[in-house]
From Swiss-Prot:
One of its GO terms (molecular function) is ribosomal large subunit binding. InterPro entries: Ribosome_recyc_fac, Ribosome_recyc_fac_dom, RRF_sf. It comes from the Bacteria. The keyword Protein biosynthesis applies. It holds the Pfam family RRF. One of its GO terms (biological process) is translational termination. One of its GO terms (cellular component) is cytoplasm. Responsible for the release of ribosomes from messenger RNA at the termination of protein biosynthesis. May increase the efficiency of translation by recycling ribosomes from one round of translation to another. The gene is frr. It is found in: Cytoplasm. This is Ribosome-recycling factor.
């Protein structure tokens, strides 16, 4: 039963890491990355669809994204969705494709981006600590229900703490790498 609790906590921690990586990949760092557009949804026959389901997004150059809609009438809808987004990008269309030029980041923008990266990392750490607390609470509840010894409880809590420390260390390295990417000119 203790193994199940620890395994469950570990799976949740891994999921938190993948969410963090996903969130960071959508933050622009002065380079074109198709995942920047993952949060953009386009109206398609009355329903909102992710851009990736109605168009092909590629990065032919380091600072250019190219969007090729699968249906030409979607061109205007995609342009509208990009303009409405918080990305601050201006689409230019030639009638069949949309090009997005990613502007160079200013020093001020880089600093703001680094703050957002750190904030996102801190939110991930808070989520990890919450997972640890939940796991430890379940272990303590097992102590009462299944008559576990103090040593068994302490050993299980130590294992949860080791896993937590490893994941927090991984988060720190992910954040440091993203900061380096943002600050490199």
């Amino acid at each position: 039963m203790i193994k199940d609790i620890i395994q469950n906590a570990e799976e949740k921690m891994k999921k938190t890491i993948s969410v963090l990586k996903s969130d960071l990949s959508t933050m622009k760092a002065g380079r074109a990355n198709p995942t920047m557009l993952d949060r953009i949804h386009v109206e398609y026959y009355g329903s909102m669809c992710p851009l990736s389901q109605v168009a092909n997004v590629s990065a032919p150059e380091p600072r250019v994204l190219m969007i090729t809609p699968w249906e030409k009438p979607l061109l205007k809808e995609i342009e509208k969705a990009i303009l409405k987004s918080d990305l601050g990008l201006n689409p230019s269309s030639d009638g069949s494709i949309i090009r997005l030029v990613i502007p160079e980041l200013t020093e001020e923008t880089r600093k703001t981006l680094v703050k957002n990266v750190k904030k996102t990392g801190e939110e991930a750490k808070v989520a990890i600590r919450s997972i640890r607390k939940t796991a430890n609470d379940k272990i303590k509840a097992l102590k009462k229900d299944e008559d576990l010894s103090e040593d068994q409880v302490k050993k299980a809590e130590d294992e949860v703490q080791k896993k937590t420390d490893a994941v927090v260390k991984e988060i720190d390295s992910i954040i440091a790498a993203k900061e380096k990417e943002v600050l490199s000119v």
